[in-house]
Amino acid sequence: MRIIFMGSPGFAVGALNLLLKLQSEVVAVYTKAPKPSGRRQRLTKSPVHIVAEKSDIEVCTPASLKSSIEQEKFGNFKPDVAVVAAYGLILPKEILNIPKYGCINIHPSLLPRWRGAAPIQHTILAGDQETGVSIMQLDEGLDSGPILKQKKFLIEKSDNYKTLYDKLSELGSDLLLKVLNEIEKQVPLKQSDNDACYADKVKDYKIYASDACEIAYRKVKAFYPKAFIKVENKRIKILDAEFEAFTSGQGEIINDNMHISLKGGTLIPKVVQMEGRNPCDIKDFVRGLKSSLTKKFIE
């Protein structure tokens, strides 16, 4: 089977590696173009790009697939199927119609719940008890195509964005293999648009004084490692935390261990990181402060 693989971040690498390990005929890899990264703004290739080059697979990095030139190039690979995993570009109808078995997508949520760009973060933010992977046939809508296979699992108390990302990536790779092995027998299941909800891209990682404590706690988990508070114009990331219910406040730091009183409870940071410094245990962090943050309020 001739496969075009389309993906960019680390989430997609597991699926590509599995296809290569099984000696599938990956005829081309489509990924986002290298972009400036780091302090020196050096052009950096996507994780998928790096894996493909090491395997001597042709890499394509178009800015768009809407032109007839790009569509003809795609068709010239004569793909039986295109596998899509966090690619980052919209696939027009002309591309969707080229592969014999269409374009199938690995989506890290239980569709139709959490269609869109940030399903893992929104799964945690909403307090969902379970999540999973959906292998779906792409259509012109936003993650609205029929489902080919789906598998779910319970979310553990210790899970955060990183742990779910890794679990879903591994599960997605395994589920993809089952779909490809049964590609001619698949019976697509239409999604219910009435049950759909959407996971917009997250742009704001701040924990606010007005947040309910449980929401703040979920933000720490969902936005790992980017959730932060601001105190006296200092930006402090919270990488791990617990919370205790029943007390209530408006963003006051109530003791020397930097416990934060919020609506419905107290957020208890465990691991934090000041801008420009390494992550550290909360006890080491407060020990290194020049002045206590007790009685101060987060912004």
From Swiss-Prot:
Q: Does the keyword Transferase apply?
A: yes
Q: Which cysteines are joined by disulfide bonds?
A: none
Which sequence ranges are marked TM in the entry?
none
Query: Catalyses which reaction?
Result: L-methionyl-tRNA(fMet) + (6R)-10-formyltetrahydrofolate = N-formyl-L-methionyl-tRNA(fMet) + (6S)-5,6,7,8-tetrahydrofolate + H(+)
Q: Which InterPro entries match?
A: Fmt, Formyl_trans_C, Formyl_transf_N, Formyl_transf_N_sf, Formyl_transferase-like_C_sf, Met-tRNA-FMT_N
Q: Which GO terms describe its molecular function?
A: methionyl-tRNA formyltransferase activity
Q: What is its EC number?
A: 2.1.2.9
Q: Is the keyword Transferase in the record?
A: yes
Which GO cellular component term is one of those annotated? cytosol
Which keywords label this protein? Protein biosynthesis, Transferase
* Sequence positions that bind (6S)-5,6,7,8-tetrahydrofolate: S109, L110, L111, P112
Write out the function statement from the record.
Answer: Attaches a formyl group to the free amino group of methionyl-tRNA(fMet). The formyl group appears to play a dual role in the initiator identity of N-formylmethionyl-tRNA by promoting its recognition by IF2 and preventing the misappropriation of this tRNA by the elongation apparatus.
Q: Which family does it belong to?
A: Belongs to the Fmt family.
HAMAP family recorded: Formyl_trans (MF_00182)
Identify this protein by name: Methionyl-tRNA formyltransferase
Q: What is the lineage of its organism?
A: Bacteria, Pseudomonadati, Pseudomonadota, Alphaproteobacteria, Rickettsiales
